């Protein structure tokens, strides 16, 4: 028997759906793959019976209820997409809310719970910064601000060992010619700066590290390094 890939997929889906039907007949509540297969198979069989797309979707939405599935399944299977062959050709059926409610919400296994908002860190230092470049410059929250773009003009000596006082993962954008006052906080942890612009590449508080970093910055043309 020669089958196309689509026909093989259809037989695989039918086998999974038959397993789901057999287990439900034994009184078992269905898991995610079983529920998904049964819903998708219902659409395909409805299409084979000559039903229209809307009718097939409605039939699939009525095949399972909250008591037919394991706890948490309704929270995972929120939509089922299946391509079925109708009388007018192949159509993609999207079955929304296929289990008919019964979700556990925040109590569902694996639910993602939003964390508490973290306040913006309080700045220990405020510096005016001017972007002398012709393009925008963005600096991220944990970048060693001392090593930020050479075309940003600010007192780099005061910014040594500091980062932006903004929430982690955010950034500050400096438009061309724009002057912005930013808040800075000391870099925490072990206070080791590796990479960035390569002006430190070691412990920030090592003897002579600040002076050497300022010398390198001035030699490389960083604005504000000679203040």
Swiss-Prot record:
Pfam families: Urease_beta, Urease_gamma
Residue numbers spanned by region Urease gamma: 1-101
Record keywords, A-Z: Cytoplasm, Hydrolase
UniProt-listed Gene3D superfamilies: Urease, beta subunit, Urease, gamma-like subunit
GO-annotated biological processes: urea catabolic process
Keyword Transmembrane (UniProt): no
Record pathway: Nitrogen metabolism; urea degradation; CO(2) and NH(3) from urea (urease route): step 1/1
Cell location: Cytoplasm
UniProt main location, coarse: cytoplasm
EC number per UniProt: 3.5.1.5
Region (Urease beta): 102-227
Alphabetized InterPro entries for the sequence: Urease_beta-like (IPR002019), Urease_betasu_sf (IPR036461), Urease_gamma-beta_su (IPR008223), Urease_gamma/gamma-beta_su (IPR002026), Urease_gamma_sf (IPR036463), Urease_subunit (IPR050069)
Catalytic function, reaction form: urea + 2 H2O + H(+) = hydrogencarbonate + 2 NH4(+)
Coiled coil: none
Family as reported in the entry's similarity comment: In the N-terminal section; belongs to the urease gamma subunit family. In the C-terminal section; belongs to the urease beta subunit family.
Subunit structure as annotated in this protein's UniProt entry: Heterohexamer of 3 UreC (alpha) and 3 UreAB (gamma/beta) subunits.
Protein's name according to its UniProt entry: Urease subunit gamma/beta
Organism: Streptomyces coelicolor (strain ATCC BAA-471 / A3(2) / M145)
């Amino acid at each position: 028997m020669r089958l196309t890939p689509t026909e093989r997929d259809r037989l695989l889906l039918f086998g999974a759906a038959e397993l789901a039907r057999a287990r439900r007949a034994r009184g078992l509540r269905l898991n995610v793959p079983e529920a998904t297969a049964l819903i998708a198979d219902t659409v395909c069989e409805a299409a084979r019976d000559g039903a229209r797309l809307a009718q097939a979707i409605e039939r699939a939405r009525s095949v399972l209820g909250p008591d037919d599935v394991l706890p948490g399944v309704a929270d995972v299977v929120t939509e089922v997409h299946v391509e079925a062959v109708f009388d007018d050709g192949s159509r993609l059926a999207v079955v929304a809310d296929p289990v008919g409610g019964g979700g556990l919400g925040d109590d569902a296994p694996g639910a993602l719970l939003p964390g508490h908002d973290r306040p913006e860190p309080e700045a220990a230092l405020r510096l005016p910064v001017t972007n002398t470049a012709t393009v925008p410059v963005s600096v991220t929250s944990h970048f060693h601000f001392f090593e930020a773009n050479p075309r940003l003009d600010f007192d780099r000596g005061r910014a040594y060992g500091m980062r932006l006082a903004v929430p982690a993962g955010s950034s500050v954008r400096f438009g061309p010619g724009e002057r912005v006052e930013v808040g800075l906080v000391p870099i925490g942890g072990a206070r080791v700066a590796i990479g960035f612009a390569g002006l430190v590449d070691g412990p920030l508080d090592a003897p002579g590290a600040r002076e050497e970093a300022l010398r390198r910055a001035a030699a490389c043309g960083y604005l504000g390094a000679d203040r």
